[in-house]
Swiss-Prot record:
Segment forming the signal sequence: 1-26
Superkingdom of origin organism: Eukaryota
Keyword Secreted: yes
Lineage: Eukaryota, Metazoa, Chordata, Craniata, Vertebrata
Protein purpose: Inhibitor of lipoprotein binding to the low density lipoprotein (LDL) receptor, LDL receptor-related protein, and very low density lipoprotein (VLDL) receptor. Associates with high density lipoproteins (HDL) and the triacylglycerol-rich lipoproteins in the plasma and makes up about 10% of the protein of the VLDL and 2% of that of HDL. Appears to interfere directly with fatty acid uptake and is also the major plasma inhibitor of cholesteryl ester transfer protein (CETP). Binds free fatty acids and reduces their intracellular esterification.
Transport is among the record's keywords: yes
Name listed for the protein in its UniProt record: Apolipoprotein C-I
Sample GO molecular function, one term: phospholipase inhibitor activity
GO cellular component terms, A-Z: high-density lipoprotein particle; very-low-density lipoprotein particle
Keyword terms of this UniProt record: Lipid transport, Secreted, Signal, Transport, VLDL
PANTHER family according to UniProt: APOLIPOPROTEIN C-I
Amino acid sequence: MRLILWLPVLVVVLLMVLEGPAPAQGAPDIAGTFRNIPNSLKEFGNNLKDAFENIPEATRKLMTSFAEGLKNFRIPMV
């Protein structure tokens, strides 16, 4: 299931990388664009890594606040 969700994202990222710089700043040859692909993918991977490193901490905070809310929860007696 995850693979199905990530494939469109991967296609969009590859299209963005292959698009290269804007035409006003465009390189005269396509070889320069192909040389930049590994660096662009590495930067993208590093950004993803940084984003996913924060997930455990955010989950821990969420679960802690949820547990605190459950501790303070009282069922009203009718």
